[in-house]
Amino acid sequence: MIDFSNFYQLIAKSPLSHWLETLPAQVAAWQRDALHGKFREWERAVEFLPELTPWRLDLLHSVTAESETPLSEGHQRRIENLLKNLMPWRKGPYSLYGINIDTEWRSDWKWERVLPHLSDLTGRTILDVGCGSGYHMWRMIGAGAHLAVGIDPTQLFLCQFEAVRKLLGNDQRAHLLPLGIEQLPALEAFDTVFSMGVLYHRRSPLDHLWQLKDQLAPGGELVLETLVVEGDENTVLVPGDRYAQMRNVYFIPSAAALKMWLEKCGFIDVRIVDACVTSTEEQRRTEWMTTESLADFLDPQDQRKTVEGYPAPLRAVIIATKPETQQSLAKKAR
């Protein structure tokens, strides 16, 4: 069984220590009552992987681990087969001892769009909401973060994360918890909170923004990446049954409307820093994700539209700040 005790020990003497009042019981309940039918199979694949210590580890420019001498062909094939038992791989890519996990998404492209606009991550404690298999958390560590905590209830993603961690030398600077944000108390302890690719899946997007704010320390930075549509501050698309074949898409605002929502929730210094149409080069079917992908979700006659006739996916990045309080300012002045 995946062991979370290292994380509990790590936060016991940190600003996250009050999370221990609820977190162990939540994780124990998940382990007892909520495991996916294939979880044991996925977990066994992780258990059979060797714990390798990289001779060269690059998390700044990619997620790449290399050994001093190449693995034998048989050893490499065994690792690759175990990793393929954890398909589909959606977020990446990873290069692990000569095994290239070519994921559905080029998440490195998103990171390169986001990174120039971030406050320096050096020494920061970070929360990544809806973190998937944890690719961006490793990039956050590469950019100097002290600790990256991801939450995502999808259990396959947890096993993929643990597999990668094991091949990175059991690195304890990043941790993934199988929770949704609605299960977190108001921790108010993270220097930076990321929510990328989550907002449009929420039935109540403003509640999600408040939940993100509740996790930030005063003066902390929110990094929000989500689907948007063209339009002014009054423009919001509410799709019917599906959007790009996804059933669980509820609200897609314009970037201007989203900026107004953030300000309504009390964020300051709200900035739209990037907008980019998602291409079929960035999201596509691969050897590691063999089912339908973006090309199947767009109108074959007009790729500016989804198969349902809505505008094709356009993603914006917005940066915002949680205001300081008198108490936080006084503490910093000491």
UniProtKB/Swiss-Prot annotation:
What Pfam family is a match, any one? Methyltransf_9
Enzyme superclass (EC): transferase
Q: Return one Gene Ontology term, BP aspect.
A: tRNA wobble uridine modification
EC assignment: the record states 2.5.1.-
UniProt cross-references to CDD domains, sorted A to Z: AdoMet_MTases
What are the alphabetically sorted keywords of the record? Transferase, tRNA processing
Kindly indicate whether the keyword Transferase belongs to this entry.
yes
InterPro entries on file = CmoB (IPR010017), Mo5U34_MeTrfas-like (IPR027555), SAM-dependent_MTases_sf (IPR029063)
- Which reaction equation describes what this protein catalyses? carboxy-S-adenosyl-L-methionine + 5-hydroxyuridine(34) in tRNA = 5-carboxymethoxyuridine(34) in tRNA + S-adenosyl-L-homocysteine + H(+)
Q: Which residues bind carboxy-S-adenosyl-L-methionine?
A: K91, W105, K110, G130, D152, P153, T154, I181, E182, M196, Y200, R315
The Gene Ontology terms for molecular function here are:
methyltransferase activity; transferase activity, transferring alkyl or aryl (other than methyl) groups
UniProt-listed NCBIfam families: PRK15068.1, tRNA 5-methoxyuridine(34)/uridine 5-oxyacetic acid(34) synthase CmoB
HAMAP family with a match to the protein in the record: tRNA_carboxymethyltr_CmoB
Q: How does it assemble?
A: Homotetramer.
What this chain does, per the entry, is described as:
Catalyzes carboxymethyl transfer from carboxy-S-adenosyl-L-methionine (Cx-SAM) to 5-hydroxyuridine (ho5U) to form 5-carboxymethoxyuridine (cmo5U) at position 34 in tRNAs.
Family to which the UniProt record says this protein belongs: Belongs to the class I-like SAM-binding methyltransferase superfamily. CmoB family.
Protein's name according to its UniProt entry: tRNA U34 carboxymethyltransferase
Gene from which the chain derives:
cmoB
